[in-house]
Amino acid sequence: MQGPHDFHTPKSSYSKEDLLESGKGGYFGPGNAQLPAPPMLMMDRITEISLDGGAFGKGHVVGELDITPDLWFFQCHFPGDPVMPGCLGLDAMWQIVGYWLGWSGSPGKGRALGVGEVKFTGEITPDKKLVRYEIDIKRVRRGKLNLGIADGRVYVDGEHVYTAIDMKVGLKNVLGGAGDLPAS
């Protein structure tokens, strides 16, 4: 395992520009974790990131997305009854777990591998202002397949609206041939 400082200068928060740079594959080095490009990048900033915080003491991340009525998904999901698809909130949490794995020193390109349980208890609509994703890292396995398992919560304007338990994200080392991800 590399240390985070081997390929970037770790910080405790990241701007939209930092996240966009990660989407180009330039933040954690060639062949390593990167975020998707817009419009699939589902956060505008990371406000907190740590190796030892959170409910399990193994890492914690907080990301945010600014809500505006012109976001692409409101135009098509659903016409006349706009709501952010719940799967995009789940994908945002997977993105954050993958980012944390790269930030913490795990090499490889990321893929979502599954989730144990998801609950949707509210909606994100265009009249809202801020989505907050809170991720607690539960377990990390580093080896041929670098694997992160985390729990997450989504809040909109302070109201808890989604919960995900046992989200799994794997990083495969495409440069060093360190194993394949399981078929999804």
UniProtKB/Swiss-Prot annotation:
| Annotated InterPro entries | FabA, FabA_FabZ, HotDog_dom_sf
Q: According to its UniProt record, where is this protein located?
A: Cytoplasm
Q: Looking at the keywords, is Cytoplasm present?
A: yes
Provide the Gene Ontology terms for cellular component: cytoplasm
Name the Gene Ontology biological process terms.
unsaturated fatty acid biosynthetic process
Keyword Lyase among UniProt keywords: yes
Record-annotated active site: 77
- Alphabetized PANTHER family for the sequence: 3-HYDROXYACYL-[ACYL-CARRIER-PROTEIN] DEHYDRATASE (PTHR30272), 3-HYDROXYDECANOYL-[ACYL-CARRIER-PROTEIN] DEHYDRATASE (PTHR30272:SF8)
Provide the function of this protein.
Answer: Necessary for the introduction of cis unsaturation into fatty acids. Catalyzes the dehydration of (3R)-3-hydroxydecanoyl-ACP to E-(2)-decenoyl-ACP and then its isomerization to Z-(3)-decenoyl-ACP. Can catalyze the dehydratase reaction for beta-hydroxyacyl-ACPs with saturated chain lengths up to 16:0, being most active on intermediate chain length.
In Swiss-Prot or TrEMBL terms, this protein is called: 3-hydroxydecanoyl-[acyl-carrier-protein] dehydratase
Point out the gene that encodes the protein.
Answer: fabA
